[in-house]
Amino acid sequence: MLLMTLISTAALITAQPAPAALGAAAVLAAPGEARSEIFDGRNWTCGPDGVCVARGPGVSQPVSRECRRFVVRFGVVTRYERDGAALTVAQLAQCNTAAVR
């Protein structure tokens, strides 16, 4: 009986759909109007609060390059992460140099 209960529970747990994963996220230093843009294989959506989220697999590239390409289009960031790992303060400083060129 216990074995059947465990099997049924395991079947229910594995049958649940996985939540849609975010590909990347960023926080803009100077929030502006809400906007949405598709580039580098991701659908970026930024709210008026400066919080940006991206969905999609993205182009295969180092995260530092992806961040630089993002700030060229959207502006300086105070946070940038991909696949759940955030850039360090030093990495963010290097990334943000692309915005002032």
Language-model-detected regions and their locations in the chain:
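Post-signal/leader-peptide non-cytosolic segments of secretory proteins
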Residues: 20-100
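Classic N-terminal secretory signal peptides
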Residues: 1-21
